[in-house]
Amino acid sequence: MADKLEQVAIRMVEQPPLYSNEPMNNPDVAIRVMNEFLSQMDRELFCIVNLQADLTPINMNIVSVGSLNEALINPREIFKSAILSNAHSMMLIHNHPSGNLTPSTSDIQTTARMQELGELMGISLVDHIITGRNGNYYSFRDKGEFPDSRVRFSTCLLYTSDA
């Protein structure tokens, strides 16, 4: 049998829309658009809303479908959607089916890490919102807990030769 390397293609496939042309410049707008979808779920869903420069949504991607009280995420899966969408910025939204909006240690660490990676890649993190039932939510930015990165990365790297 000859050695061969299979070629695969990764493409975004459109799903039925969640309608919004309104800029997601505050959590109330994001919840108005996303809560009906997320509040019906019996397990955690971790989503990214990819945004244009004026914060108008480009699309939404479900990054992870978890269990009753956790969803495993990988930064690569978050940024894959943002890069393929040519996003200027992004908003992270996930639900807590229990209705308890208190962020877990993992939620806090994920927010800090995604902000750092977003700065490095030039795709800023606008907010991370945890939604419960009945439109209740927790916004990291509104609560003043949105981490400020200690290190600022340039989004434009210059390589020079010493020769």
Please name every model-derived segment:
Residues 12-16, 24-27, 31, 37-40, ...:
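Glycine-aromatic-enriched surface loops/turns that form tight recognition elements
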Residues 36, 42-71:
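Mobile, glycine- and charge-enriched loop segments
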Residues 41-43, 122-123:
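Short solvent-exposed loop/turn micro-motifs enriched in small/polar/acidic residues
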